[in-house]
Amino acid sequence: MKAFPKSDVPQKATKAVSLAPNVTSVIELDLNRYLTPPKSWIVPLIRPKNPVEHSAKIYDFNSLLSLQNTKLDFDDVEEDRVAAYFHTGGTTGMPKVAQHTYSGMIYNGWLGHELLFTEEDNVICPLPLFHVFACHVILMAMVSSGAHVVFPTPQGYRGDGVFDNFWKLIERWQITFVITVPTAISALMQRPVDADISSVKTSFSGSAPLPLELFRRFEEASGVTIVEGYGLTEATCLVSCNPVEGEKKVGSVGLKFPYTDIKIIKSEKGNLVECKTDEVGEICISNPGVYAGNTYTEADKNADLYYKKKYLRTGDLGRKDSDEYLWITGRAKDLIIRGGHNIDPAIVEEALLGHEAIAFAGAIGQPDQHSGELPCVYVELVGGATVTPEELDQFCKENVKEPGALPKHIEILEELPKTAVGKVFKPDLRMRAIKRVFSETLDSSGVNASITSVDDDKKLGLVANISSNEDDDTINQILGDFTIPWQRASN
């Protein structure tokens, strides 16, 4: 993108190219051509500078496009093949690139057309087009169904004025279907519904678990029912969804889509076996969006990624109930999901391990009422070393290159919990973080309640046990925006 007001994407791209000497060409797109006067007159006057720090040749996208033939001048290939590459979060500290086929993309668009949208629908999608849901589901479904889509800004929800004008945008474009994520719902609930949104029929939420209390607040404020779904970049996108028309189970991510199969597996005596109803295990999926055997561009990253050679092992933990509804209870992989965005804990851990006083570091996602999870890190010091959390916080600001990965809480422990082979045992750290965050939240509310423990429940996943004389509604008002469930502590 050519330098543009209120965007640092061009500057980041220039810096990236300067660090990649093998890049010889850059294709640049100028957003100003899509503006109308007087804005199109103003942009050239206030366009920020973007000094070129590389030797790559820069081409204008539209100039190149005008030189091309308007019809195919080669024989089109009829067989299926890779059509797109999308980066996805990983646990190794190195980016993974997922391969998406034409059939997988068409499948996602077909689902949107057949099950969600018609040519009468107006959809608002405040997700950026580098998000698989925006690109493969919404864009493809619009082409397939003839529905109309509104993308408020290139940055999605993060663009200026999106939240403050969201309800008015719905009224202006007579939106019937809202695409959202839990973080955005939380932000919208801090703003009054200041427009006529009676045109909205349904709202879809994905990317991260949706707290029950947030679900209820949105429904009460807007009169719109939220439909929760599940998908992932490695599967091109869609996996399951609560029925738009039919029984919706709040907290569940619904039923599998047509031509999708879901298995829940566990390891038993060294073998992978399928779980029984309501038994928690790893979620494995097979559908046209799964490029079995070739999910990632690097072959070694596809090793041990499949069950029975066709089911993608997602790394997510979940269960299927007696009605075949899918419930996600946790993650076998360690990714921190902040507002629907994946953060690799290795980014924080590797930075801190560069500090001379740090022997071990374990980064996790601690519960947050707005973002779902926020980065949190526990460290163990080298024998005899001394350092303060404040000093480590400053060290992170200087060495953690991804702003969203900066830890919101740093705690020094005498010794980190470890496995038998010496690896940091993160489930204990997650329980510790849940107890601390929930305790702080209860204390600040002034209610008579305390967290006695945090357990790993076979059906619910991690759950906080609370001792209190307060009624359930009072506790729900305080803790309901967290995705971690709570229950009364047994006597």
Please describe what each predicted stretch is.
Residues M1-D8, E171, V178, N287, ...:
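AMP-binding/adenylate-forming catalytic core of the ANL superfamily
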Residues P152, T180, T202-S203, L210-G229, ...:
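Conserved AMP-binding/adenylate-forming
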Residues E28, K39, R47-H87, M94, ...:
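Conserved pre-ATP/AMP-binding loop-to-beta segment of ANL
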Residues M1-S63, P485-S490:
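Structural core segment of the AMP-binding/adenylate-forming
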Residues F4-A16, L29-L35, L127, T153-G156, ...:
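Adenylate-forming
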Residues I106-C125, F130-T176, R191:
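Conserved AMP-binding/adenylation subdomain of ANL enzymes
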Residues A83-Y107:
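Conserved AMP-binding A3 loop
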